[in-house]
Amino acid sequence: KRKKLLLVNPVNRESAGLVNDPSTSFMPLGLGIIATLTPDHWDIEFIDESFEQFSVSRVDLVGLTSFTSNAPRAYEIASICRENGIYTVMGGVHASMLPEEAKGYVDTVIAGEAELIWPVFLCDFEAGNPGQFYQGSATPVELIPQVRRDIFKYPYVNDLVQTSRGCPMGCDFCSVTQLCGKQYRERDIEDVLDEME
């Protein structure tokens, strides 16, 4: 039986400024990677609230990403899903930094890099026993897949390609080392060029 996954990039409509302007929005690469890692028996839909507001639909699973700026809206969407009996999973920077907070709103939290843990979560979900918390680890660069861009149906002005992860600097104001570690990891240049084409 086919299953349906809805991936949502929430936008906090109460905030003003560039973060809510479609002309400055960018593709959420993390959700594109999740789409790449999701097996073919799942139908995938994607909503970016910079362009289109979330509305409840018949899906098996809703996946949310989160920066701190949009976490309140992500929690709002999760609450709507819960009211309608839809299972929610949340990842991204905010959920990774504050997993206990996120757990108060969603069914499952995935913290850290998701490449190695998303397939495990999906297997558990399909078996009917998903965990409440999964901790991802630093993904070897050769296992970082290309972003599945066909799900991005909106007229993004900006496009991104992730060429590396991690940073050795550990600046106080930055979350990169907490999320991706202090080891700087570069993707293979041929793989990056292939993705750009």
Cite the ranges covered by each PLM segment.
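N-terminal [4Fe-4S]-dependent radical SAM core
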Residues: 14, 124-163
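Glycine/Thr-rich phosphate-binding loops of Rossmann-like dinucleotide-binding domains
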Residues: 15-16, 72, 119, 171, ...
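Nucleotide donor/acceptor-binding cores
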Residues: 3-4, 60, 159, 196
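Radical SAM [4Fe-4S] cluster-binding motif and immediate context
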Residues: 145-197
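Alpha-helix N-cap and loop-to-helix initiation/capping positions
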Residues: 22-26, 69, 109, 113, ...
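Short glycine-rich His-centered loop
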Residues: 2-25, 79
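Short beta-strand segments
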Residues: 6-9, 63-65, 162, 175
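Glycine-rich beta-alpha loop elements in corrinoid/cobalamin-binding modules
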Residues: 30, 34-143
